[in-house]
Swiss-Prot record:
It is an enzyme of class 2 (transferase). InterPro entries: CmoA, Methyltransf_25, SAM-dependent_MTases_sf. GO terms for biological process: tRNA wobble uridine modification. It comes from the Bacteria. Homodimer. Its EC number is 2.1.3.-. Pfam families: Methyltransf_25. Catalyzes the conversion of S-adenosyl-L-methionine (SAM) to carboxy-S-adenosyl-L-methionine (Cx-SAM). This is Carboxy-S-adenosyl-L-methionine synthase. Belongs to the class I-like SAM-binding methyltransferase superfamily. Cx-SAM synthase family. S-adenosyl-L-methionine binds at residues 35, 60-62, 83-84, 109-110, 124, 191. One of its GO terms (molecular function) is carboxyl- or carbamoyltransferase activity. Coiled coil: none annotated.
Amino acid sequence: MKDEIFKNEIKKQFEFDENVASVFDDMISRSVPYYRESCELSGEILARSLKEKAKIIDLGCSTAEFLIALHHKRPDFELFGVDNSESMLKIAKRKSMAHGAKIDFKNEDILNCDLKGFDCAILNYTLQFIRPIKRSDFVAKIYSNLANNGILIMAEKLIYDDKTLAAQMIEIYENYKQKQGYSAFEIAQKRKALENILIPFSETENRQMLKNAGFKIVEVIFKWANFAVFLAKK
């Protein structure tokens, strides 16, 4: 279903409700530059890096698009998805069944879920929706619970410290969204709805947070303008 949520004036903050869930796959593919390509890259790396029957948890799994892709790459993976949106999980369950993917879903706040014993954790554009004051402790929790040599994949929207560059990146990104079929009005409406909901860090801040949590290796494996995918190894 095509994302047309912001064609009309919105008077509430952004939330992952039934309306958003119904168009989420279209929304993220048109809103995050090279989303499918970056997920494909992350999936390829995990397929080559993780042991047989590795346990993977996607924190903020939305409609399970990434988990389903992992299932097709490595059917032996044990896959788990957590999301606090029941509407998202309803679609995720339906999609996973259609693909024959066995995925254990849980409707829960990711800050409170049990993370022990996983070989890999996924945060695909999830951390940016968590209050900044809680992020460091949550990333540290992920690190401490990952198995030895565990991997964290973390995709995030970024901000730039240089004000001129930051303004240029915003303009470039808005031009990108218009090329994806969004009107200037829709872009402005969504930006307003996301104020104080989506709060990005800089690349440096994200790197430092991962290092402070204890990760030995922190690399950016994909980047386009103000979007990046981090890979961190325990």
